[in-house]
């Protein structure tokens, strides 16, 4: 894999140990340390991303994503139960998904367009980290996680891009 570094800078600002310092790279995992520190400083340890639910008079449910990185199947199951209590069992006339909290045209230098789960783009309404974890058995594709139902979209995406056997792909 390509790499680059600036390991040491002297008191005058001269780079002492340098390799490919001017080439752009996907940030290494250690970058997450600085990101986490900054998030704790700015947002605080009690900050939680929100997914908001609104029901209008015509019984259309609006779901507005707020960038929750841990919106996963287990959380959705709990939210569904809470929604039934809050809005009753009368059928909905529609559901509108709103992912407009983040701009849709975000481009991050170094991010590659691959099927690898670690390359999945984030969004304001990402579910299960914008990935599909499935199993291909012959012509059948099923969820690899008992708590995660598989949708027709997930099946078609995994059929087109997923590996034989068990695997995870980005959406």
Question: Language-model segments: what does each one mean?
Answer:
Residues 1-27, 43-46, 82-89:
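Beta-lactamase-like hydrolase cores
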Residues 3, 15-18, 35, 65, ...:
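Generic, low-specificity signal for short hydrophobic/alpha-helical stretches with a mild N-terminal bias
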Residues 41-171:
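Conserved serine DD-peptidase/penicillin-binding transpeptidase domain
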């Amino acid at each position: 894999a390509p790499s680059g570094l600036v390991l040491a800078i002297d008191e005058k600002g001269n780079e002492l140990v340098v390799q490919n310092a001017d080439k752009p790279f996907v940030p290494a995992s250690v970058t997450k340390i600085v990101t986490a520190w900054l998030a704790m400083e700015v947002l605080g340890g009690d900050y939680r991303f929100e997914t908001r639910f609104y029901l209008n008079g015509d019984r259309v449910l609006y779901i507005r994503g707020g960038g929750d990185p841990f919106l996963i199947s287990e959380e959705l199951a709990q939210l569904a139960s809470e929604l039934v209590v809050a809005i009753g069992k009368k059928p909905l006339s529609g559901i509108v998904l709103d992912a407009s909290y983040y701009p849709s045209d975000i481009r991050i230098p170094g991010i590659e367009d691959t099927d690898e789960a670690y390359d999945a783009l984030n969004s304001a309404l990402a579910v299960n980290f914008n990935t599909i974890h499935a199993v291909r058995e012959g012509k059948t594709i099923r969820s690899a996680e008992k708590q995660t139902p598989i949708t027709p979209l997930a099946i078609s995406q995994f059929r087109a891009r997923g590996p034989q056997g068990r695997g995870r792909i980005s959406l």
